[in-house]
Amino acid sequence: HFIDVKCTTSKECWPPCKAATGKAAGKCMNKKCKCQ
């Protein structure tokens, strides 16, 4: 799912994804973070 975090690289999404889902897995898509 997408979370409301802007990004330029996938690495930027790992900490917020870990906070949101418990897993540090995510990608940057369309400048927004998508968590696994």
UniProtKB/Swiss-Prot annotation:
Broad class of the protein's primary localization: secreted
Organism domain of life: Eukaryota
A GO-annotated cellular component: extracellular region
Cellular localisation: Secreted
PROSITE patterns, alphabetized: SCORP_SHORT_TOXIN (PS01138)
Family matches, as InterPro entries: Scorpion_toxin-like_sf (IPR036574), Scorpion_toxinS_K_inh (IPR001947)
Pfam families xrefs: Toxin_2 (PF00451)
Site (Basic residue of the functional dyad): K27
Keyword Secreted attributed: yes
An annotated Gene Ontology molecular function: ion channel inhibitor activity
Organs and tissues of expression: Expressed by the venom gland.
Keywords tagged on the record: Ion channel impairing toxin, Neurotoxin, Potassium channel impairing toxin, Secreted, Toxin, Voltage-gated potassium channel impairing toxin
Domain remark from Swiss-Prot or TrEMBL: Has the structural arrangement of an alpha-helix connected to antiparallel beta-sheets by disulfide bonds (CS-alpha/beta).
Biological role stated in the UniProt entry: Potent selective inhibitor of Kv1/KCNA voltage-gated potassium channels.
Protein family (similarity comment): Belongs to the short scorpion toxin superfamily. Potassium channel inhibitor family. Alpha-KTx 01 subfamily.
Protein name: Potassium channel toxin alpha-KTx 1.9
